[in-house]
Amino acid sequence: MMRKLSPGSKIVLASHNAGKLREFSTLLAESGITVISAAELDLPEPEETEETFTGNAAIKALAAARASGLPALADDSGFCVSALDNRPGVYSARWGGPTKDMQVAMERVHREMGDNPDQRAFFVAALCLAWPDGETRTVQGECHGTVVWPPRGDHGHGYDPMFVPEGESRTFAEMSEAEKNAVSHRGRALTAFLNTCLDTSTQKTERK
């Protein structure tokens, strides 16, 4: 039988990114999952050596689960631009240089796109849930849209200010957290994660 998390479980988010911690905590709170960050536990960040989002998510989740003794959830996400052959992709954070400055990263995307009329882009989020014994479960979500320049908005993080999702006129960074979560790659991956990895039988029993 596939192992699942019970409501009330505590998991480690295998990330030192405060923005991601806030986003995941909000998304998982309704399901009764308590999230603590790898930074709180002072866990090291493993090197991401895979060429896929799911591969890198698994590296991070397994490292955090084994180090903490708790189930761990890792996300590996990236920005894929059609005109750049879907780069920066898994190297999205590295495009910000040694300090991962996302303003630098966005300027590089804009510079490399040049006058290319193809403005299509999409975000990918892969989530991996790992247990200390090495068992893993992986899901993925995508959100398609277009690149805009100059960047707009003060919310969100990463490449959010230069991306407008399909059906919207605002960038991710111009949306509220709830609005973004409803359509984002991470929100879609979380929905798949909850459907796949959360044991809802307890909740159903409690409602009766």
From Swiss-Prot:
Recorded catalytic reaction(s): these are: XTP + H2O = XMP + diphosphate + H(+); dITP + H2O = dIMP + diphosphate + H(+); ITP + H2O = IMP + diphosphate + H(+)
Which Pfam family, giving just one, matches this sequence? Ham1p_like
The entry's free-text remark on the cofactor is: Binds 1 Mg(2+) ion per subunit.
Positions of substrate binding: 15-20, 77, 157-160, 180, 185-186
Q: Which GO terms describe its cellular component?
A: cytosol
Tell me which Gene Ontology terms the entry assigns under biological process: nucleotide metabolic process; purine nucleoside triphosphate catabolic process
For the keyword Hydrolase, the answer is: yes
Active site as annotated: 76
Q: Which residues bind Mg(2+)?
A: 47, 76
Keywords, comma-separated and alphabetical: Hydrolase, Magnesium, Metal-binding, Nucleotide metabolism, Nucleotide-binding
| Keyword Transit peptide in record | no
Instruction: List its EC numbers.
Output: 3.6.1.66
Q: Which family does it belong to?
A: Belongs to the HAM1 NTPase family.
Subunit info here reads:
Homodimer.
The job of this chain, per UniProt, is described as: Pyrophosphatase that catalyzes the hydrolysis of nucleoside triphosphates to their monophosphate derivatives, with a high preference for the non-canonical purine nucleotides XTP (xanthosine triphosphate), dITP (deoxyinosine triphosphate) and ITP. Seems to function as a house-cleaning enzyme that removes non-canonical purine nucleotides from the nucleotide pool, thus preventing their incorporation into DNA/RNA and avoiding chromosomal lesions.
Name used for this protein in its record: dITP/XTP pyrophosphatase
The species is Gluconobacter oxydans (strain 621H) (Gluconobacter suboxydans)
